[in-house]
C-alpha cells in the first residue's frame, strides 16, 4: 500500500472508477493487494481484495514509509496526503462536480471527526439539494432502513426512559469505516489527516476492502455533493457514500437516464441476498400470502385497542405541527422541525406494535431483527413466483422440519422486505408502461409519496384485521333470540349482494413520506351523488337542471365522516389514508349499526385535513424530518403504487450455505451440478452476482454495443438423454439478484450454467442438505438409493418384522398383516391380473432374500413357515425357484416334464389325489396361523430366527428386498413414490489410460477396448482429456454398426446384449502444438449395475501404427488404392485414410472375397474404428503366389539405392519415428463420417477351411479430387517414370524376383513410435522372398511402384494420401498389408504361359489386331491427324506381353513395327472421335468390364461416369490408349458410315461434385439461356404488336366499308318507302271520300224513311205504356 500512496497519476475512468488488467495475476483474494509497480497503466487495477482483519491491523495510515519508497524510485514526495490510485468517483449526471476539496480546506474553525453523535443522525435536513439524484435518495433511504431494522427496537425502549446510559447498538454505519484503528468489535474510526480510509462492504460474494481518500466533491454553489449530517464536520456519511458509489458505478444502467441499476445498498451494507419479485396482477394473492408469512402481523388485543384509543385522544390534543406517538394524520398539517424532539416518539410508534404482538400465537421477530423471521405456522400453499413468473412461497414448516439433517438447532430464516417503484420517464417507449406509471403516480400522491422521487420503502408489518377493534354490539335480551324475524325490504328491484372485502394492509416506512407534498382527498366512490340525467329524460332535454352543489358537498362531507369509521378500522388512527375511506365503505357496507360511534372523532380528523388542504404551497415547510415515517396501505393500492418488492434473506439463518466465485475474462460458461435429496419439499435460495465489466473491459461509450447481462440458468439434468431439461431458474442481472427454487419431494439433479464476461459469484442457501460442484463431486451421490427408496423399503421391512413378532398373537396378527399389505401394496389396482402379479413379485423377492441371508443350513420347515406367513402355495415350485424375476412373471403354470398322453381316468385320479394332499397341506398352513398350536409355535420360532438375522442389518436387507422387486419391472411398482427417483439413479465406472508425448499434426489411437454387455441398458460414455481433438467411436461387433453421435459426441444409447460386445475406440489429433504426456479417462454412466465390463483384465495403451503413403494417380475406376490384409491370428484393427485435399470425398471399404463388410465415407479423411480380421486357412508362409501379397522388394541395385535414401531420410524424421507434417487442414478428425456395414457371418465351427481374403479399398467419390495443372504435370511425370521402370525391368525379365515395390510402411509400435530398422527388415524380406521364389516355378511379374512419399517430401501442392492401420503392439508382426495386384498378376501369368508355349504369339496378335483395325477405319490426311507416338498408342497389354514374352531384340523389333503400323493407321482417329460420342460406348464399357472379371460394379459406374464427363466437356479428341485396349470384335464397320452424334443427349445422369467451376459454368450457361430467351421473347412480342396493329387497321377498314354499304342501303330503302307512302296516302284519301259519300246517302235515306212513317202509331204506343 505504501507504493499506492505515493502514486500521483490522475486516473481517468470510462464510466467506472476501476480498471483491471486481464492477466490472471490481478486476481489475488484473501490478502491485502499491494501494487508495487511504478509503471502501472492508467485504468488498470486489481479487483478489490477480500476483507482481512490482519491486513487492517497492519495497515499504514500515513505517508511514513511510502515517502521513502518514492525517494528510491526517483520521485520526490511532494504531496503529503493520500490520493486514491483508482481515481475520483463518478457522480450521476444530475450532480455537476465543480471542484474537489479536502475537509481541512473547508473546516477552519473545527477539527473534522468521523463520528459526532452515536445515537441519532439526520441525513435529510442538510441534503435537500441532493434529493434530485436517484442514487442519493437510495443511499439515504437504505441507510435509514438498515438503522431501523437493527436499532429501531433498542432505541424505542431507550427513548421511553428519561435517563440511562446510551444503548449498545448492534449496527452502526460508521463501523464499516476504518482509520487509525484496529479491526476489533466496536471500533471507532478516527480522523486521518493523511486522508486514507478503508471501508468494508459486501460485493461479489464476500466482504471487500475498499480504499478511499477524503476528497469531497462540490458544485458551483459550494454545496457538498455527498450526503452529510447536520454536523458539517462529521465525515462518516461522505466516506461511506464514496465507497458505496464505487460499487454502484460498476452496475450497468439499463435505462439511459436511470442513475441506479440493480445495485442495492442493503446488500452492500449487510451481505443479505436480495430476491426481486415483480408485482404482476395475476399473482397478487400469492404475493399477499408470501408477505403475510414473512412480515410481522398486527393483531388486535385488549391492551392494543386501549392504547390506540388513548393515542387517538392524545393526537387530537396535540398541535398540528407536532407529531406524537400516533400522530400521523395531524402531521400533514405542519411537519416538525426539531429532529431530536420527534425522533424518540417516532421510533416508539414504529416498533411498539411488534412488541405487543409477541403475545399472539404466531411468533414475531425480536426488536433487533424485526421483520426478518418467517412464521413457523405459515400457509402450506405451494406455488412458484419469481422474476420470470414462478416464485415458490417459503414453506416454513417443511424447512424447519428438514433441519434434522443439520447439526444446528431449529431456526427460521430472517428476511427483510422493501418495495420500489420506477420513476416516470417520458422516454419510455411502451405505452402500457406509461399507463402503469401514471396509475402508480396517482396512487402514490394519495399516500404522500412522489413518483418523481423514486426510492425504496421499507415494508414493516402486515395486517388482516381492523386497526381499531369495532365496539361490541349491546347484548340482546334472550326473548329476542327466539324466532328472529328477517328484515324485509320493500322494493321491486333485486338486491345486490355486497361482498365484504378482506382486510389486507401493509405498513411501509419511508423518510420521504409527505416530502414537498400537499395532502388531499380523492373520493373514489360516489354513492350519494345523484346523476343530473333523470330517468325518462333524454340527455339533450331543455329542462333546467337543479344545482346540487351544496347537497353534493354536504353528502361528500357526510360520506367522508361516515367512511372514516371504516378508515379507522382500516388504517391506524395516527396516520392518514387519503381518499381510501370510500373504498372501505363499499367493502364493509353502510348497514353497520355501530358505525357512528367514532363519527365525531373522524369529523375532527377530516376538518384538520380540510384545513391542511386550504393552506397554500408557500406555507409548506421546506424541510422534512430525518426519521422514517410509517403509513398503512391497502394491499391493492400497494400493488398499483409499487412495481417490485425486494426480499433480503440473511444467509446465516440458513442451515447450509455454498459460495463460489470465479473471475476471468472469458466468454465461457461455467457449469455446476447440484444434488439434493429430501423427504420434504425442497427450497433453495440461489443468489447470483455478475461482474460484466471492469475498467477498460466493457467500458461504455456512445458507439459501443450494449453489454449483455450476466446469466444464470438452472435446469433439470439427466445423463440418459440429450434433450434439455425443463428450466427451473433463469436470472439476468448486471449486479446481484436472488430467487427461491422450489422442488418437490425426492431426489433431483440440477445443472447450473453461469455466464458473465468478467466474473461471477453464486451463493446457494437451504435448510436441507445438498451437494454442489463439479461432476466428479456430485456423481457419487446418485449411486446409493434415494431417501424415498430407503424409507419405502424400511416401511415394508418393519411391517414384515411386525408380522413375525405378532405371529403368535391372535389379536394383533390380522392388523399386522393389513399393515404389511398397505406397506407393499399402497395403491389398490382394479386390474386383478396386475394385483396377482404384484403379490407374486413381493412373495418371491421376500423368499429369495430370506433364503440368501441364511448363514447356516435353513431349518427343515423353513419353506413351510414362509408359506404359512404369506399363504402362497404356487410360489415355491422347484421349476420356478431359479428363474429370473423378469422371466418368472410370464410363467403362470408348470409345464409337464414329458409329452406322454394320459387317459382320462389317469388324469382324474391324479387330480383327485393332488386335491386331497393340497387340502391337507392348506389345512396345516391355516392351523399354523392359529396361535397356541404346535404348528404355530414351530413356524413362529423359525420366522424369529430368520428375523434375527435380518434385524442385524435391517436397512441393507430392506433396500435389497425392494431392489429385487424393482428388477422384476412389474408395472405395479410404478405407483410407489420412490419410483420417480429411479430416473436419477445411476452407476458409473472409470477406465484410465496414459498416452505419451505427441508431436504436432499427428493422429493416434488413445483407447481401444471391447466391452461385454450383460443386460440391455441405457449407457452414455464421457471422455475426460486435455487433448484438443478427441473423438470416441463405438462399434457393435455383431452388426459392425456405429453408435450414433451428435456433434462428434456419442449419444445415450440402448446397448443390447450381443455375442461379441462393443468396441470403444478413441482417436486423437494433436493440432498445431506439441501434446505432453497425460492421462485419458473414459467414464461409463449407466442406469444400474452391473455395467459393461472389459473383455480382458486391464485396458491396453500400447499400439502399433503402420503408415502407407503414396501419391494419387487418377484412373477410370476412381480407386485410390487397394491393399490386401493377411493375419496369422484373429485380431482387431483400426483403419484410417487421410488425403492431402481436405474437401475430397472418399469412401473406405473392407472387402471380404469382394463383398463389402464395412464402409465409411468422409471428407478429407475416413476411418473404420474397428474391424476384426479373422485368420486365413493356411499360414502366410505356405500360401501360393497367387494368394499371397507380400511386401514388394526391388532388385539388388534398387534395394541399395532405397536403403541409402532411407538412411538420409531417417535423419529428418522426428525422434518418435512419426512424420511431422506442417499441413494443418488435412485429416482433421472432426469431419463427419458415414459408416455403413453388411451383417457379418457368424463364426461357425462347421466351416473351418474357409479362406478369408480381405481387401482394403479406398475410392474417390463424385470426382471430388480434381487435380490442378501442376499436379497433373507431376502425375504425368510419375507415369513416365513408371513406364521407364517397366521398360528397364523388361530388359532383365529373366531374373526371378518377387512381386511389387516397397511402399512406405512406417510402423509405429505403441505410443513410443519406435521404427524398426529398415536394413534389417529388408534383409528378412529378401531372405523370405528368395525362399518363396525357389519354391515357385514361375515368378509373377514385378510391377514397380513410384518412390514413396517421405516426410520431407510432403508437399500440400502434391496429391498424396496416407493409410494408417493400428494394431496392438504385441500383434503387429502378425499383421501383413500388401498392395493388391492379384488380378494383374493372373493376366500376366496367363500371357507368360502363352508366350512360353508359343514364342512370338504376342507380336502376332498385335499385328493381326492392327491389321484388322486398318481394314475398315476411315483414313484421313496426316494434317488432320498427326502421328501418334508409341507410348500413346501401344496398349498396356501389348507392352506387358512384349516385355515378358520375348527377348530384348524381339521387343525392339516389335515396338518398331507397331509404331510404323500405327502411324499409317493414325488417320482413323476421326472415326474414333465419332464413336466416343455415341451411346454404344456404354455398352462397350459394360461388355469390356464383364469380360475382365475382376472389376466391381462401382468401378464400372465410375468409369462410365468419367468417360461421359470427358466426352461432354472436351468433345471429340484424339485416339487414346484406353480406347485401343477395347476388344476389336466390338468395333462395327457400320460406324464408319453412320453419324449418331445427333442422337446423343449431352446430359449426364450420374451425380457430379458441385464445384465452384461447375457452378460458375452452369450460371453462365443459364444466364446465356435467359438472355437468348429474352431476346427471342422481345422479337416475338414486337412481331405480335405489329400484327395486332395491322389487324386493328384491317378491322377499321372493314367497319368503314360496312358502314358505307349500310348507309347506301338505307338511302335506297328510304326512297322506296317514300314512294310507297305517297301511293298509300292517295289510296287512303280515295277510300275516305268514298266512305263519306256512302254515309251521306245513308243519312238521306234515313231521313226520308222517318218522314214516311205515320204519327198515330206513336201515340198508341204511349197510351199503352200508361195503362
Swiss-Prot record:
InterPro entries reported in the protein's UniProt record: Androglobin-like, Androglobin_II, Androglobin_IV, Androglobin_V, Globin/Proto, Papain-like_cys_pep_sf, Peptidase_C2_calpain_cat
A GO cellular component term found in this entry reads: sperm midpiece
Compositional bias annotation for Basic and acidic residues: 353-384, 1325-1340, 1433-1450, 1499-1511
In this UniProt entry, which cysteines form S-S bonds? Answer: none
Renumbered residue ranges of the record's region Disordered: 1-45, 347-387, 540-566, 1297-1355, 1420-1522, 1646-1667
Q: Which Gene3D superfamilies match?
A: Globins
Where do the coiled-coil regions begin and end? 1588-1629
Which annotated residues bind heme b? Answer: 792, 824
Task: Please provide the Gene Ontology terms (biological process) for this protein.
Answer: proteolysis; spermatid development
Here the segments flagged for biased composition (Polar residues) are 554-566, 1301-1315, 1451-1468, 1512-1522
What are the protein's GO molecular function terms?
calcium-dependent cysteine-type endopeptidase activity; heme binding; metal ion binding; oxygen binding
Domain spans labelled Calpain catalytic: 70-411
Entry keyword set: Cell projection, Cilium, Coiled coil, Differentiation, Flagellum, Heme, Iron, Metal-binding, Spermatogenesis
SUPFAM superfamilies noted in UniProt = Cysteine proteinases
Give me the stretches of Basic residues compositional bias. 1-11
Start and end of every IQ domain?
906-935
All residue ranges annotated as the Globin domain in the record: 763-890, 936-968
| Pfam families per UniProt | Androglobin_II, Androglobin_IV, Androglobin_V, Peptidase_C2
Q: Which PANTHER family match?
A: ANDROGLOBIN (PTHR46298:SF1)
Q: What is known of its domains?
A: The globin domain is circularly permuted. The globin domain, which normally consists of eight consecutive alpha-helices from A (N-terminal) to H (C-terminal), is circularly permutated and split into two parts. The part containing helices A and B is shifted C-terminally and is separated from the main globin sequence (helices C-H) by a potential calmodulin-binding IQ domain.
Q: What does this protein do?
A: Probable chimeric globin with a bis-histidyl six-coordinate heme-iron atom through which it could bind dioxygen, carbon monoxide and nitric oxide. Required for sperm flagellum formation and maturation of elongating spermatids, thus playing an essential role in male fertility.
Q: Which family does it belong to?
A: In the central section; belongs to the globin family. In the N-terminal section; belongs to the peptidase C2 family.
Q: How does it assemble?
A: Interacts with septin SEPT10; contributes to in vitro proteolytic cleavage of SEPT10 in a calmodulin-dependent manner. Interacts with CFAP69. Interacts with SPEF2. May interact with calmodulin.
Name of the protein in question: Androglobin
